[in-house]
Amino acid sequence: MPQLDSGGGGAGGGDDLGAPDELLAFQDEGEEQDDKSRDSAAGPERDLAELKSSLVNESEGAAGGAGIPGVPGAGAGARGEAEALGREHAAQRLFPDKLPEPLEDGLKAPECTSGMYKETVYSAFNLLMHYPPPSGAGQHPQPQPPLHKANQPPHGVPQLSLYEHFNSPHPTPAPADISQKQVHRPLQTPDLSGFYSLTSGSMGQLPHTVSWFTHPSLMLGSGVPGHPAAIPHPAIVPPSGKQELQPFDRNLKTQAESKAEKEAKKPTIKKPLNAFMLYMKEMRAKVIAECTLKESAAINQILGRRWHALSREEQAKYYELARKERQLHMQLYPGWSARDNYGKKKRRSREKHQESTTGGKRNAFGTYPEKAAAPAPFLPMTVL
């Protein structure tokens, strides 16, 4: 360390030696770094603004020269247009993170330019562009381009297609600096799922203008009126499925009812009468006239006692009549069996018993009453 003299001149010399060291250490260090950082940050933006202004001026000059025949500046305008395109491609390679200026051309993708949701998709993406980014550490700032161009070409002059990645049918993949962790994957909504699939397999195929501005709070709502915002669970039976099942049940019921009607229309074939039945048929009117009893059971008991009181010769006459009755019945109904009538009676009695005990309606395939269909349980949706 240099020795300072105690005199006035030595003190002045010592002050001169120590002043530059103090200024370098405490005053100029932070200011120089701030100036360098500001210059480095403002350099790319200033270059991009100069490129855009030169492109607009050259395109206007080329369009004005091409509209007037015989002007020698038309060829120079075409060459200027080619040079402008080359500089634009170079600027896109130098600054891949910058968002292009024309919002109207970029938002209307080839799939959205024709269809029934053209205007609604444009408005939905307009909202997405101006929604503030989610607060979180480590995320890049999301640029918000202006909605209107500063310099519009005059009416009637064709606009130059300066940005090819919006007009190409195959969209460019997302930039490499945006990882999959930073991209939110909300649920698909009906108004956007038809145009951009937001599944994990197709996230890499989205244009970066769409993948940057997919915010969960906006995507959960519906941009198109009349469409539900939530997707129903597959376990819930839709009303259309119930409507499809109802005609099927009606067809089954009509088939069962038609079968029952056919069986009811068939005439019931009675079995041939035996000897005692023939005697009852002949003597019943006489017993009713003689007795004051009107009950059928009492009349049958009286006829039974009289039948057993008859002799063998008298009973043989009725047995012969019964044999002739059976022969005639066999000729009229050759394939008839007494089991057919007994089966019908059993079925009818079983149906009546079921209806009286349960009071419900029988199913076409069983003897149990139909129950009301239990509604499907509602499963809550989980937001990923």
UniProtKB/Swiss-Prot annotation:
Residues 374-384 have a biased composition (Low complexity). Residues 1-16, 62-78 have a biased composition (Gly residues). It is found in: Nucleus. GO terms for cellular component: beta-catenin-TCF complex; chromatin; nuclear body; nucleoplasm; nucleus. A motif (Nuclear localization signal) lies at residues 344-348. GO terms for biological process: canonical Wnt signaling pathway; cellular response to interleukin-4; gamma-delta T cell differentiation; immune response; regulation of DNA-templated transcription; regulation of gamma-delta T cell differentiation; regulation of transcription by RNA polymerase II. Residues 269-337 bind DNA. Residues 1-88, 133-183, 337-384 are annotated as: Disordered. Keywords: Activator, DNA-binding, Nucleus, Repressor, Transcription, Transcription regulation, Wnt signaling pathway. Induction: By TCF7L2 and CTNNB1. Transcriptional activator involved in T-cell lymphocyte differentiation. Necessary for the survival of CD4(+) CD8(+) immature thymocytes. Isoforms lacking the N-terminal CTNNB1 binding domain cannot fulfill this role. Binds to the T-lymphocyte-specific enhancer element (5'-WWCAAAG-3') found in the promoter of the CD3E gene. Represses expression of the T-cell receptor gamma gene in alpha-beta T-cell lineages. Required for the development of natural killer receptor-positive lymphoid tissue inducer T-cells. TLE1, TLE2, TLE3 and TLE4 repress transactivation mediated by TCF7 and CTNNB1. Binds the armadillo repeat of CTNNB1 and forms a stable complex. Interacts with TLE5, TLE1, TLE2, TLE3 and TLE4. Interacts with MLLT11. Long isoform interacts (via N-terminus) with SOX13; inhibits WNT-mediated transcriptional activity. Interacts with DAZAP2. This is Transcription factor 7. It comes from Homo sapiens. The gene is TCF7.
